[in-house]
Amino acid sequence: MAGQKQELPVSGEPLAVESPMTNKKKKKSKKNKHTEENHEVEEVPQEVTNGVEEELSNKEKKKKRKREEKESEKNKKKDVPEKKLEAEDLGEGESEQQKVVVTGKGVEEAKYAALKTFAESNLPENVLDCCKTFEKPSPIQSHTWPFLLDGRDLIGIAKTGSGKTLAFGIPAIMHVLKKNKKIGGGSKKVNPTCLVLSPTRELAVQISDVLREAGEPCGLKSICVYGGSSKGPQISAIRSGVDIVIGTPGRLRDLIESNVLRLSDVSFVVLDEADRMLDMGFEEPVRFILSNTNKVRQMVMFSATWPLDVHKLAQEFMDPNPIKVIIGSVDLAANHDVMQIIEVLDERARDQRLIALLEKYHKSQKNRVLVFALYKVEAERLERFLQQRGWKAVSIHGNKAQSERTRSLSLFKEGSCPLLVATDVAARGLDIPDVEVVINYTFPLTTEDYVHRIGRTGRAGKKGVAHTFFTPLNKGLAGELVNVLREAGQVVPADLLKFGTHVKKKESKLYGAHFKEIAADAPKATKITFDNSDDED
């Protein structure tokens, strides 16, 4: 903590420890006034002086001062509050410095200092074998490993492509090795020790690939279970004994209810893309699955946003004082490495405009271009339309069998068919390298989904382009989209401003000091599902 400035707590509020670089960045923060209102995670109470207070007599003022002094003295005697660390971090492949905020009890302890190198983790060589191609830990790995390796419950908020799979994967492997005493080899273990929940099949497979590669040098066995494929091989693999299970909520619940999968030994649980999981209507099966794990467990949640329903789930199943690590801004923000082009047009003009854009961006038919549709039937129609126009295209959506989806994704990744049409099933979490252009044929239902869609390009420090069609039907989201564009320093077209810049107020805060802002009597939202592409069999 050398060279850092410490500010004394105000009225019992958490201690803020800031680096000099953080102070520099704060001076620059005035340029986006429209985002300032929601930018602070924790508010410092301030004296509010109204007209009545100004007229207080000297006697009343003295009494008021004494009351404040007594209150201040009481706060000093209370337990030491949670700390908050703020620092600037430059991660692997990041084009600019990004803010890292770590909150929770004991975060200022030396043992929790962010890792600058993999060697500082003091992990066994076979555990770090999967990291040898990386120069240093990414920011999310650097800041979360010290806590996770110490057994702390943790909430991680970071954009996709930040290295979060290994952020929870390496600590999960170490947890299993210690639990099963397998560092030097060990006996066969039937029931799993670690469970990773994913909202989609594609993301589950991607996580499984990473954990299988990371766990093999340590002698660990993992299995990926999801709907849309035969249960037979999955059941056989589980019965033969596994250490780590990765799966989607529907199939996991099915296997638990049929007494094939027993989670009583699971003591390390990860919820990846937690916000997406609940948004897709999986809250009830997620609760059922978590209730079947060991009561003594370490819980990890990763999410791109932190809405109220995810807060409540965390409050119920996590330690009351989890560590919270936020990489980047807590506000909805797009990747600054992506050039965002918004084109306002009539719905009927989209087909011909799409062809014109492909002739511009995909003339070589070798670079990867990802086209987003909103509905499954729309994705099917676009795939046929493009093929009829002579473009080599494939698609992934819920109406396709899992084997077809896997094949389409493989063809796109390897470059055999570098034009992919997808619904939002591919928008979150998937690591598809070298996507040069994203085209939003239909604007998504939320600006959050828009940010995640365009995040498929501009990854690992590379530049990308996102071209979006915006029609009068989307005008209700114009204000939020304008804010996203301005935050990223992008051009806001005059045609978009014609729809207005009003942003509907959200009923609850997205972020706060863990769970303090949760309203116990908040009404449960009614979910409307438009694309059930990930309903489990």
UniProtKB/Swiss-Prot annotation:
Coiled-coil annotated spans: 22-80
SMART domains with a match to the protein in the record: DEXDc, HELICc
One GO molecular-function entry: ATP binding
Major subcellular site: nucleus
Binding site for ATP: 158-165
Motif (DEAD box): 272-275
UniProt keyword annotation of RNA-binding present: yes
Residue ranges annotated for the Helicase ATP-binding domain, each copy included: 145-324
Domain Helicase C-terminal, chain residue ranges per copy: 349-500
One GO cellular component term noted in the UniProt record for this chain: nucleolus
Domain of life: Eukaryota
Residue window of motif Q motif: 116-142
Biased composition, class Basic residues, residue ranges: 23-33
Alphabetic keyword roster: ATP-binding, Coiled coil, Helicase, Hydrolase, Nucleotide-binding, Nucleus, Phosphoprotein, Ribosome biogenesis, RNA-binding, rRNA processing
Residues recorded as bearing Phosphoserine in the entry: 533
UniProt function note: ATP-dependent RNA helicase required for 60S ribosomal subunit synthesis. Involved in efficient pre-rRNA processing, predominantly at site A3, which is necessary for the normal formation of 25S and 5.8S rRNAs.
Domain notes: The Q motif is unique to and characteristic of the DEAD box family of RNA helicases and controls ATP binding and hydrolysis.
Protein name: DEAD-box ATP-dependent RNA helicase 5
Native species: Arabidopsis thaliana
